[in-house]
Amino acid sequence: MFDEQGSPRMYANILLSTDGSDVAKKGVKHGIALAKALNAKVTVITVTEPLEIDYGGGHAGGWVPSKEEIDRFDAAHKESASKVLDEVRAMVEQIGISAELLHVPNAYPAAAIIETAKSKGCDLIVMASHGRRGLKKLLLGSQTSQVLADGSVPVLVVC
């Protein structure tokens, strides 16, 4: 991407990831402000993980959910993701930019973030240092670590 003078822009297409946690909201706010300052395109992603099924590890036990349980699980995740994205929608409208808002269901967050950045042509990922699973501020979250290790796009980590 190039600016009005024909000079290349460093970041023109930014992917923001959020799980709705307080630290993720902070990351989204930083990403939105950066996108506004750079006049960059914004895509926001929230990912909900698949239902874990216990096949019993080769033993007689295990648990396989019914269709109704799967439907309830999917509906709850869809509702949760909708709330997260509604909050982000309000943030981007308040600052005066537009954003594409995506929910990726039944996926693993790091893989979905990396794939979305690639498929959308993003040149920067902004994400929190840790999300809901973060135990301590001193530790980098597992999803963030995986995006840093496996991704090919620069990552801005907000703590």
Residue map of PLM features:
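Short glycine-rich, flexible loops that bind phosphorylated cofactors or substrates
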Residues: 23, 109, 133-135
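Structural beta-alpha unit
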Residues: 2-9, 86-125
